[in-house]
Structures are given as structure tokens and as C-alpha cells.
Amino acid sequence: MSLEFYKQIFEDCLNDDGLVVMGSGLGIHNIILGFLKFYSDTDDLVLFLDCQSNESLQNSYLFYHERLLNFGIKYSNLPTMVNVETVSSSTKTNMYSKGGVYFGASSIFVLDYLTKRMPCNLVSGIIIQNAHRITDTSIEYLLIKLFRQNNKKGFIKAFTTEPSLLVDEIGKLQRTMKYLHLKKLFLWPRFHQHISLILDKHPPDLVELSIGMTNSMKRIEESLHLNTQRCISSLIAINKLPRLNGGNGGNDSDSFEQILKQQLKPMWSKLNLHSKQLVSSIKLLNQLKNNLLVYDCVTFYSLLLYIQASSDSLKEGLHTNSNYVDEVQPWLESKEAQNLFSASQERVYRFKKLNSLKSPPKKLKTINNDSSSSSSSSNLEKILTLEDNPKWNVLYQILQEIEEDKEKQGTILIFVKDETTVNQLSTYLDYGGYSFLLGKYEKLCSNQQYLDELRKKKEENNNNNNSNNNNNNNNNNNNNNSVKSLSSNDNGGYSRYRRTKNFKDNRKQQIIETSKKKKGKGGTNDQNLFNMGIQLVDGHNKLNIPNPKFINQDGSGGGGDNGDENNNNNNNLNINDGLTIASMNEEINGLNDFYELLSPPYIVIHPISKSLTILDEIRPTFIIVYDPDISITRQIEVYKAENPGTPVRLYFMTYSDSSEEYQYISKLQREKSSFEKLIREKTNLIIDTEQEGKIQLVDNSKLELLDDMKSTRNSRLGGLMKNFDSIQQQQQQQQQKKTIIIDSHEFKSSLPVVLHNNGYEIIPLRLEVGDFVLSPIHCIERKSVSDLIGSFNSGRLFTQIEAMNRIYKNPILLIEFDPNQPFYLVAPDELQKDYLSPFSLPSKLVFLTKTFPRLRVIWSRSYYCTTKIYDQIKDGYPEPDPSMVNVIPEVNDDQNYNFNAQDVLRTMPGVNDKNINLIMDNVDDLYHLSKLSLSEFSTIMNDSVNNNKNATLLFNFFNNQLNQ
């Protein structure tokens, strides 16, 4: 921590526990790294939590593990990742007793504490990352609560870089501080005096480049905006919604989608199909606005063709699955959509009337092998335009300017949005814009031609099938078989087309590098770029800059930017054709006559994500921010402040008057306004002196007693309480711990947290049957709505209920749903029919209850409602015994009884839990049972005390005729 404000933040947090809220990109990871380094050198037991996700936790572990290793921390003192699969329970106690820093999911630490594997009094403290996500139902809150109940001296350090998420709700900051058991709040925005003085003292040499979009791109963006507005207006009109506050589907698409989702969530189940299609269209159009600025012209046009083909196939019924019906895009039939496709097509190619007196110009490339080839027969000529991305030309000019600057030579670092842009720019610099786009266009034509051939074959076979309808049966069968075969081929072609247009970013696992280009001078304009070499980095944590590559001296690897006929066919461009370090070391002696070392400068293209260490490892002289981002610009400022003597020139590229520029500015303004709200709220923040829990823990569940207190007041006595004795008894009963046994897998949910808040003593066990054991006779299988549907489809639920029914007297199926997410058990269209399908969810529930008559189904609308239901079920019953759980009673031993026969016997009249075992002990099978007399039934069932009522029912069941 070389900067002064880092030291100040570290000292403040070291002296007092608190929540640190820091601006994005200012290096909050350096503060966390300082604490990890500080406690790694000691024997203290420190827990590291991440409130965001397990993936974020794993990425943090890899990052901090490598950084601490670089700092010289002993390997034995490095942090340890605690995983259920890798660390057995028998070794955890010894592991925790040795101390150290441990990364792990909060649910694992809670289980280790409740099972006494982790001595909570030995834990020195907890470090929490992404603390803004903690709530009163999160498992992190339960861990902090258990920690503070048994450890009054341990520290709690919380960190976050999302100030906007602390002010998006009223009282969110105060609740977050309460859940974290903290009293101090440390705010460090970019405009903080200490930070501004340090970062503004040594700013980088900034060159801002505002790039204008082409006319076609402006037309596309305008069409997308108009389509979005049309969809929003239709959505409001159809559902009679109020105006969507906070957004209009404009440039700030991220915030608008959140507002749209929040306002439509309570009524989602009531929306008709057309409304859901409009919501899907709004999201897609906002995504296309971002894709317009990132993708090349051919990729963007092919994406539009894929969307159109997908929507058309759904309309034609090629996909019978109802899950894909929402993907139909109604906006494709609008006039704005035609303008969108027209402008996108003009970026790739355009049509020109063919002059019969003159031959077509030779400089223009003509390809007529795609879906529009038929237009060539009508005196039209297709001319490729292949419009370059405007940022490509500016990037080329920047690199040319850097190369001409002989005084400053060093590594060039280009920051891009994601790995898709990394591959795009690397291929552009390798092969030139024309060759790169031409290869993409030829792939598009080949795919389109393939689909056209399939469509024509299908139409021909359909016509042949219709003309032969009057033939004999054999001919009809042959025609039907051929139609089926062609239909399957058509689907396969569609799947192939879909796979080829999958533009998701692929996560790489290693560093990809290419620097193979011609060393000699001369040639096309792009050859100057290749002299620099190109290195691609995927953002992996363990970044190791490889040794310099070798370049071909005879110029066999060169490539031009213009229409070189030998470079037109680039369907299979491979940028990973560089030699490996091992192979170079083996053959280095034989290559000296043909290769020489690549001279600087080098070009490193890196995605913005996971770029925390790339600046220190590369130490670039020139930095190009290709896609604007708040975090990366501030990382560059911090890097320059840490290295004031290192010259750094920063090129910052943005599209002028675009959604990209608007989103960047809006994020800056949103962060600034959020910090200003936090500063004002901090001055008025009400903090309980006992909130830290070092004296007494505050339990939020006690607030629910106010409803009970209201019922004990008498209005005629001036509000005085009545029945003081009953109130005291009620309070004593509530103070007594209620025990509940929970399956260890259920700690991934929030229900154990709510149960603990309401005074339950939680005992975690790995249950073989059920999820919750409330008493010796009550066992609950808990399902969410989605899990319920999946369990019915797989048959797992039937097996689970069958196991509970054999062991417990009162098996219960609890169906829990989210109150903020409405749902329907039956599709609205099916309710209009005269009968329900036997495969519908209500029909399956009815079948389940008829199969298991003792099963009870309970619906719960929230975790808090579930807790009250558990209180009612447990009332008057003894607490469960953990030693008896997972133990099958002796009377139900599977060695003595046939469970299938037992299930049949339970459905007969007169058979109950008191006499079923007596019957099975004295009768061999059902046939023997049906031949018994009434007196024998009474003797076996010991039913004389009941006036032979049950025996008579069972005897009549076997002996009465059906017509009686």
C-alpha cells in the first residue's frame, strides 16, 4: 500500500470495526489484501466471506492467494479454501485449531459452528466482501449473529464498492449496519479530499477521442429506439399500466430493465402472451443497442437474421415447446424494423443497377451465392461495402502515431469490454479490416445458402406429397417417410445455424498469444501494426507474461488490409498458431538462421474484467481504453499515482452522442449522488450503542410480539394490560428454546436463518428422510414451486413421500413460494377447458394425496409464514431427539414386513396404526387375510374393546358383494 489514503483506510479499520464504502476502481482490494497479509503472518483464525456468490468467492481466493504468494508469504500460511467436498469433517477441528485465514461459503461455516467443529471463541474475526448484499434472511447474517453471541472480542471488517445499492431503499444503510453488527461507516468516494489530492497530483497524459458513428449506425440506433418506445407504449396500453417511472427505454438500458422488472414482477402471472413477448422484445432491443457498438457489421447483421429466422420458425410452429413462445418478436413487422434491416444490410452490401453497356467495375467484389442471389437476375448487382467499425480506424491511427513516436517506446495495453472484443481486435490487427469482414461475410453466405437449399427441398417434397395423395398406401408411406426425413434435416439445419450464431463469450483457461508477422518493410498499411506483435490475454488470475515470440523473417505470415485475392478466403482464421515456449527452447538452435527476436513495442489486448493486476505486471507506456468503463479509468489513475516517474499516455475512446457515452456519464453521476446521500444519511444515522453485539445482541424477531401485545390490551381500562399471569407465561414459553432438526442441505436457503431469529434451536444433521423434523411424529419435505414441478417430473417426490410415510406418523409436504413472484399452477388457457389434464400439477397433487392418505400438504407464502406454521405444528408435542433421527423403528424393519403389502393394507377400512402391526404379525399374505372369519379378525386385531367395529369393517370389505 504505497498510497497515503490506503494507509489511512487501513489504520481506521484496524482500530475500529466498520463498513468501508469505496468508489469503484479505487483499489478496495488493496485494503482487503493488507488485512489478509496482516493476519496471515499470525496464528489468528480469520474467516473470509463473500455475500455475492460462490463464483465471486472462488475468484477472490485465487486472486488473493496469488498476490500473497508474490508478497513472500509462506506457503503454509496462505489462505485455505474450505470446501465440503475436499475437506472432511474429521479434519476440520484440527484445521481450525491451527489458525489461519479461511475462505468458504457462509453455510459451511454455520454448519461447522453448530456441529462444534469450529471453536467460535477462537475466531479472531470475519472479513466480509460485497457487504451491501447482506439481509436479515441471508446466511451471512446468521453466521455473524452466532459469532457475536459467543465472541465479544472478535473483529468484523466489511467492504463494498456499490454505494448506489445502499441508498436504493429507505433505511437500507441503517439495516445493513445492523445486520453486520457495526457502528462505524467509512466513506471514500473519488471526490474525497485525500484521494483527489493524490490522484490529481500525477495524472496520466490523457487524450480523449470522441468518435462519431456512421450514418448507417445512427439510422440503426434510431430504429432501435423507436421500436423500444413502440413496445413500451403497447405494453402500457394493453395492461393499463401507469407510466413506467425512472426510465423510458432510452440510453440507460440497464437501469430501465431493472425498473421494468420491478414493476412487472407482482403481476407477471397475469400478463398475457403478447405482453410477455413485448417484455422480451424490450430486453432484446436494449441488448441490440449495445451490440451495435461492439459487433462488426457482418456479425450484427447476421444476428438480426438469426432473430428473424428464430421468430419466423416459432410462428410457423417449428418449435412446439411453449417455453420458446415468448421469443416471438412482434416488432419485426413494424416499419422501423424494415429500416433497421435496411440500414444493417447497407453496412454489409448494397445493390446497384447493372448497366448493360458497361461492365461492372473490377474493384467491387460481387458475391451472389446467398439468399439474395435471385436479385441478380433482375439487372441488380450486389456490391460489398463491409463498413469498418469507426473505432477500428481510430485505433489504427493511434497505433500508427505511437509507432512514429521514436522517443517513447514501450508496451501498448488496450482495454476492451470482453473477450469477444479481444478476438475481434486481434483478428482485425492480424488480417486487416477487409479480409476479416470478408471471411465473416462468406460464412454468412454459406449458412444462408444452406438454409435456402433446405427450404427449397422441403417445399418441393411438400408439393410432391400433395400431388400423390390419391396413390396407393405404399406410395403414401414412402412419401410420408421422405417428408419426415426432410423435416428432421430442416431442424438440424436450424440448430446448426443457431450454433454458428452463438455470440456468448467463451471463458478461456490460458493465455493466448500471437505475434507472428512479417518483419520486412513495405507492403500494405497494416504491415506497420504487425511489426509490434500482438498478445491476447484472457484475464486469467495467474498471468505470466511469456518470453518474446519469434517472427518469420521471410515474410510468409504477412497479410494485407486491402483486396488481396490470395487473402480473401479466411473462413478458418486461426490466431493461436504461435509456437509454444517449450517447442521454441527445443529447436532454438535450428531456427536462428530464419528467425530473430521480436522488438518492442508490444500490444496487449485485455478484457476489463479481472484486470486488477495487469497494469503492475505489464507496466505499459501507452494505454488505450477502447470501451469506456469507470473502474478501469480509476485503476489507471491509481497506477499512475503509484508510479509517478513512469510516463503513461492514456487514449480514451467513446462514441459521441451514443448510449455508450450516456451510460458512462450516468454511472458517474449515479455513484456521485449515492455518496452524497450516504454522507447526509451518515450525519443522521441512528446507531444503537449495543448494535455491535459485544454487550447484548439485538433480536429483530421480538418486534413481532407487538401484534400479540395489542390483543392483550383492554380499551375500557385505558389501554392497560389484562391477564398479567398469562402474559408472563407466554413470555416464558417464548424464552424456552424450541428444537428443530434440519437437513444440512437446507442451509443454502434462508429458512434456517428465520427460524433461528424466532428462537429455534437449530440442530443440523444429514437426514436420510425429509428436510425438517419438528417432533418424533412430524417430518416435513420442503419444496419450492419450481422444485415441486421438477420432483414430480422426475418421480423423486413420490419416493421421498413414501419414505416419510413409512417412518413418521404425520408426513407433511410444505410448498413454499416467493410472495414477490406470483405464479400459477395451471396455465390460464387450460382453465378454460372442461377438464384438467392428468399431467397438470393439481392433478398430480390429487394423485399424491390419494396414494398417501396420511400426507398433509401445506402452502406457505414466505419464510416468516413457514415459521408460524411450524409453531402451530409443534404445539403440544415433544421436541425431536437427534439420536432417533434416521433410525427406522424396529416394528417397521424391512426384514419383517413387505412395504408394498403394508401400503395396500393401510388403504383398507378398519386398519389403523394400532392394529396394522398385529395383522401383519399373524397373517402371511392378503389371500390368507381375506379367508378369515369375523371372530378371527376380532382376535387378531384385538378389537373386542371397540365392540369389533374395525374387525367388522374389514370383514365386510372382503365378504360383501359389489352390488350390495
UniProtKB/Swiss-Prot annotation:
Domain ERCC4 span(s) in chain numbering: 739-819
Any one GO BP annotation for this protein: double-strand break repair via homologous recombination
Biased composition (Polar residues): 483-492
One protein family per Pfam: ERCC4
Function: Structure-specific DNA repair endonuclease responsible for the 5-prime incision during DNA repair. Involved in homologous recombination that assists in removing interstrand cross-link.
Superkingdom of origin organism: Eukaryota
Subunit structure, interactors included: Heterodimer composed of ercc1 and xpf/ercc4.
Protein name: DNA repair endonuclease XPF
UniProt keyword RNA-binding, yes or no: no
Cellular-component GO terms for this entry: nucleotide-excision repair factor 1 complex
Positions with biased composition (Low complexity): 462-482
Subcellular locations according to the entry: Nucleus
Xref: InterPro entries: ERCC4_domain (IPR006166), Restrct_endonuc-II-like (IPR011335), RuvA_2-like (IPR010994), XPF_nuclease (IPR047520)
Keywords: DNA damage, DNA repair, DNA-binding, Endonuclease, Hydrolase, Magnesium, Nuclease, Nucleus
E.C. code: 3.1.-.-
Reported cofactor(s): Mg(2+)
SMART domains: ERCC4 (SM00891)
Principal cellular location given in the protein's record: nucleus
An annotated Gene Ontology molecular function: single-stranded DNA endodeoxyribonuclease activity
Similarity annotation: Belongs to the XPF family.
Record region (Disordered): 360-379, 459-529, 545-571
Keyword Membrane: no
